A protein has these predicted regions:
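Helix-loop boundary and gating motifs at the non-cytosolic
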Residues: 7-48
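Helix-breaking motifs and short loop linkers at transmembrane-helix boundaries and internal kinks
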Residues: 41, 73, 94-99
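Residue-level signature of mid-helix packing/kink "hotspots" within the transmembrane helices
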Residues: 55-63, 147-148
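Helix-to-loop junctions at the C-terminal end of transmembrane segments
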Residues: 62-73
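Structural signature of the two symmetry-related core transmembrane helices
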Residues: 76-90
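Paired small-residue
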Residues: 99-107
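Cytoplasmic helix-loop-helix junction between adjacent transmembrane helices
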Residues: 106-142
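C-terminal membrane-cytosol helix-exit motif in multi-pass small-molecule transporters
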Residues: 172-186
C-alpha cells in the first residue's frame, strides 16, 4: 500500500512561510526589552506590559480567527494577516513615541494570532487526510526551528548591529515568507 504524498511544492512553500514568519518574530523577541529601555527609556514594568500586549492580543483574536476562517475564504484572510504581521516591522522602524509602539505591538499580536491559526488551517486543507497529523507536526517543527535559531541570531545582531538593522532583517524575513505564502495554492 502506498502512502498519500505529503511533500508537495505547496506544502514546502507553506513550511517556508511558517519558518520565515516565526524567524521574523523570534529574531526581535529577545532584543525588544533592550530596544524599549535604550530608545524609549522604559522601565522593567513598562517593558513587561508592552511585551504582554502582543500575546494578549494574539490570545484574544484566536477564537474569532477560527470562526472567520470557517466563514470566509481562508487564503485571503491568511495573506491579509501575514501582510499586516510583516508590515508592522516597518512600523517599528517609524514609531517615534512609545504610545505608537504599543499600538503597533497590539496590532502585531492580532495579526500573529490570525496568521498562525490560518496557516494551520491551510496546512490541513492542502494535505491528504491520511497524513494530516504528520503534516501539522512538520509544520509546527518550523516554529521550533525558528525558535531555536531566531533569538540567538537576534542577540548576536544586537551586539553588532543597530536596532533598525534587526527590524529590517525581521521585515525581510516577513516579506520572503509572505511571498512563499502567496505562492501556496489552496
Amino acid at each position: 500500500m502506498t502512502k498519500d504524498r505529503l511533500v508537495t511544492i505547496d506544502y514546502c512553500r507553506i513550511l517556508a512561510a511558517n519558518f520565515l514568519l516565526f524567524f521574523a518574530f523570534y529574531l526581535i523577541l529577545p532584543v525588544l526589552p533592550f530596544y524599549l529601555t535604550e530608545v524609549f527609556n522604559a522601565n522593567n514594568a513598562t517593558v513587561g506590559i508592552i511585551l504582554s500586549c502582543y500575546t494578549i492580543a494574539a490570545l484574544c483574536i484566536r477564537p474569532f480567527s477560527g470562526y472567520l476562517l470557517d466563514t470566509l475564504s481562508r487564503k485571503p484572510l491568511y495573506l491579509i494577516a501575514y501582510f499586516i504581521f510583516t508590515a508592522i516591522f516597518a512600523g517599528y522602524l517609524l514609531a517615534g513615541i512609545l504610545s505608537l509602539f504599543i499600538m503597533l505591538r497590539i496590532v502585531h499580536g492580532l495579526a500573529f494570532g490570525m496568521v498562525t491559526v490560518a496557516g494551520n488551517t491551510i496546512v490541513i486543507d492542502i494535505t491528504p487526510s491520511s497524513r494530516r497529523g504528520e503534516a501539522v507536526g512538520y509544520y509546527g517543527l518550523m516554529n521550533n526551528t525558528a525558535m531555536s535559531i531566531g533569538p540567538m541570531v537576534g542577540l548576536f545582531m544586537h551586539e553588532t548591529c543597530s536596532f533598525n538593522t534587526i527590524f529590517i532583517c525581521s521585515l525581510t524575513s516577513g516579506v520572503l515568507g509572505f511571498i512563499m505564502a502567496c505562492l501556496v495554492r489552496t
